[in-house]
């Protein structure tokens, strides 16, 4: 186990995985930090507000939301223990800001939001960030939460076959992955230095991009566009 001579040195350490006693202590420390709590509350409100807006492509075929960008930043700052209640708060506020859903408030979406925030925190909190890591985090959320769990919730609420929601959700979420990862990279590279000056994330956090990341992103982008076009043509033939 590595020992740190000063508290400052401990506050700047990054972790390869969250499975460390020091990682847990650092995350728990955020529960007592006024600065972190205030920033988390502010980003919760911003995330919920942005969540009610979206871009629509191809009629009702594809909706592009941007709240995941704020959610990732929030979890990068707050850590896993704050991220879970933050996810619940964001879902509740989003429901209220949007004027409610005709089907009423559904707790399944609150669970999805809490799990999504936890995943982002495990990937981003006190970690060395890269395009591959951003892509992996978004892939995990898209597949496990948006596709698998989301299809269950839609089946419960609207009654159509699970496989119908699963197939359409999988195609849309996988096709959007390269774009979403690129947006995260562009935004976070601009905002990380600002957050460091605000002292809400360690100064040692950085975002690196290697040549293989560009190659991987290009391939993923081509596949995503091809899948999206093929599905759109199939649905409108």
PLM feature spans:
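Hydrophobic alpha-helical membrane segments of integral membrane proteins
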Residues: 84-89, 108, 133
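Hydrophobic transmembrane alpha-helices
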Residues: 2-77, 81-82, 86, 102
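Alpha-helical transmembrane segments of multi-pass membrane proteins
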Residues: 68, 72, 110-117, 177, ...
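Residue-level recognition of pore/gate-forming positions within transmembrane alpha-helices
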Residues: 44-48, 90-91, 113, 142-143
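Membrane-embedded alpha-helical hairpins and interfacial helices in multi-pass inner-membrane proteins
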Residues: 4, 52-66, 99-107, 124-237
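Alpha-helical transmembrane segments of multipass membrane proteins
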Residues: 48-52, 72-73, 92-96, 118-122, ...
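Interfacial segments of multi-pass membrane proteins
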Residues: 78-79, 90-98
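Hydrophobic transmembrane alpha-helices of multi-pass, membrane-embedded glycosylation machinery
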Residues: 88, 92, 186-187
């Amino acid at each position: 186990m590595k020992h740190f001579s000063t508290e400052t040195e401990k506050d700047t350490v990054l972790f390869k995985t969250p499975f460390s006693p020091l990682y847990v202590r650092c995350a728990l420390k955020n529960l007592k930090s006024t600065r972190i709590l205030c920033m988390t509350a502010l980003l919760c409100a911003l995330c919920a507000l942005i969540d009610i807006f979206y871009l629509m492509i191809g009629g009702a075929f594809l909706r592009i939301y941007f709240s995941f960008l704020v959610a990732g930043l929030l979890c990068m700052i707050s850590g896993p223990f704050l991220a879970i209640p933050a996810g619940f708060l964001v879902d509740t506020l989003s429901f209220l800001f949007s004027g409610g859903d005709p089907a009423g408030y559904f707790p399944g979406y609150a669970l999805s939001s809490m799990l999504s925030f936890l995943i982002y925190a495990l990937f981003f909190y006190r970690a060395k960030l890269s395009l591959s890591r951003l892509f992996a985090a978004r892939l995990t959320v898209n597949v496990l939460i948006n596709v698998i769990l989301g299809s269950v919730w839609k089946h419960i609420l609207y009654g159509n076959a699970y496989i119908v929601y699963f197939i359409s959700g999988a195609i849309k979420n996988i096709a959007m992955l390269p774009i979403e990862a690129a947006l995260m990279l562009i935004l976070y590279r601009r905002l990380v230095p600002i957050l460091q000056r605000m002292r809400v994330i360690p100064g040692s956090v950085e975002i690196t991009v290697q040549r293989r990341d560009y190659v991987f992103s290009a391939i993923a982008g081509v596949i995503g566009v091809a899948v999206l076009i093929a599905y759109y043509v199939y649905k409108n033939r």
